[in-house]
């Protein structure tokens, strides 16, 4: 059972990003409970790399619960270039948020990690016990170590103060309100933008890399529903992987084909193998999640891709790109 319900003020950092917008939608569509007040904030409300601004935000909101999504993020090529920036900014953000939550007496914090935190050299499938078993992939070590430190801090806050600070580890998230920037975005939104442009220009589609790497994609609206479950019901300090099953892993080539199909693209598709593939796979086990929620139903991948492509086309002018 989760902790007792009652009046709650839930602060969501990174509230205007991909996952924050998905949680907003799911709450607005009926997932919110009586007695819950949801407060979504973005970098416009406070610079969370600044301790004083973060403290002021927490003093003002006085959250009983926090979903911590705010982070400096970017795709593979941006990470390779700016490892120091990713390390410093994220360490500052995370320390400021967790300590401000502690100072105002927040009852529970759920932070968002990433599967890139896992050791580069590992056995598959990855599970929650393996986080600290070796160094992460060298391409984005700054971001990965900063995210790992959230787990270290959560354990320390529990050991020293008894705080219920925990974290979730989603696999590759995609959906409406993603960053569709081709240079800086993640693989699926980048593909969606590329297909849109190729279709508009009547040109060929070039996919970066060989198309062979495999990923577990999770639709942002499914992840939002799981985040709300974690907030209410999951009381371990140890993190939990939020992912589709291993059998639902798809190759980048298959992902590209799903986007091509969803957008009715009829042009030529080529793969540029001179571009880096990143990690070949990072298959994660969702065994722990399934032990808690054996009947949770994920949106089928092709349907989720179709909905995301439709959102991007309908909101092309406003979309982050």
Swiss-Prot record:
UniProt site positions, description: Important for catalytic activity: 114, 116
Residues marked Lowers pKa of active site Tyr (site): 147
Reactions that this protein is recorded to catalyse: GDP-beta-L-fucose + NADP(+) = GDP-4-dehydro-alpha-D-rhamnose + NADPH + H(+)
Gene3D superfamilies: NAD(P)-binding Rossmann-like Domain (3.40.50.720), UDP-galactose 4-epimerase, domain 1 (3.90.25.10)
Enzyme superclass (EC): oxidoreductase
Residues that coordinate or bind NADP(+): 14-20, 147, 170-173, 186
Pathway: Nucleotide-sugar biosynthesis; GDP-L-fucose biosynthesis via de novo pathway; GDP-L-fucose from GDP-alpha-D-mannose: step 2/2
Entry EC no(s): 1.1.1.271
Signal peptide span: none
SUPFAM superfamilies: NAD(P)-binding Rossmann-fold domains
Positions of substrate binding: 194, 208, 215, 277
Catalytic site positions: 143 (proton donor/acceptor)
Key words, A-Z: Isomerase, Multifunctional enzyme, NADP, Oxidoreductase
Subunit structure: Homodimer.
General function of this protein: Catalyzes the two-step NADP-dependent conversion of GDP-4-dehydro-6-deoxy-D-mannose to GDP-fucose, involving an epimerase and a reductase reaction.
Protein family membership: Belongs to the NAD(P)-dependent epimerase/dehydratase family. Fucose synthase subfamily.
Name of the protein this chain belongs to: GDP-L-fucose synthase
Organism encoding this protein: Cricetulus griseus (Chinese hamster)
């Amino acid at each position: 059972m989760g902790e007792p319900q009652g009046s709650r003020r839930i602060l969501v950092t990174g509230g205007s990003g991909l996952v924050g917008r998905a949680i907003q939608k799911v709450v607005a569509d009926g997932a919110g409970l009586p007695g819950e007040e949801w407060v979504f904030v973005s970098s416009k409300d406070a610079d969370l790399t600044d301790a004083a601004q973060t403290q002021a935000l927490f003093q003002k909101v006085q959250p009983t619960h926090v979903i911590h999504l705010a982070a400096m993020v970017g795709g593979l090529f941006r990470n390779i270039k700016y490892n120091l920036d990713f390390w410093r900014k994220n360490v500052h953000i995370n320390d400021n948020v967790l300590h401000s939550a502690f100072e105002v007496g927040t009852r529970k914090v759920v932070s968002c990690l990433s599967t890139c935190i896992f050791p580069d050299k590992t056995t598959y499938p990855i599970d929650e016990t393996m986080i600290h078993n070796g160094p992460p992939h060298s391409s984005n070590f700054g971001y990965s170590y900063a995210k790992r430190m959230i787990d270290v801090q959560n354990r320390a806050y529990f050991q020293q103060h008894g705080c219920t600070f925990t974290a979730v580890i989603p696999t590759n998230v995609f959906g409406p309100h993603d960053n569709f920037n081709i240079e800086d975005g993640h693989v699926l939104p980048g593909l969606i933008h590329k297909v849109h442009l190729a279709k508009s220009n009547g040109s060929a589609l070039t996919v970066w890399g060989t198309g062979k790497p495999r990923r577990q994609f999770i639709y942002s609206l499914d992840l939002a529903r799981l985040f709300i479950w974690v907030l209410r019901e999951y009381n371990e300090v140890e993190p939990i992987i939020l992912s589709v099953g291993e059998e639902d892993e798809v190759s980048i080539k298959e992902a590209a084909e799903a986007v091509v199909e969803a957008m009715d693209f009829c042009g030529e598709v080529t793969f540029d193998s001179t571009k880096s593939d990143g990690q070949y796979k990072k298959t994660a086990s969702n065994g722990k999640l399934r032990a808690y929620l054996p009947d949770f139903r994920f949106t089928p991948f092709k349907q989720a891709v179709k909905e995301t492509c439709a959102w991007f086309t309908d909101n092309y002018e406003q979309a982050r790109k």
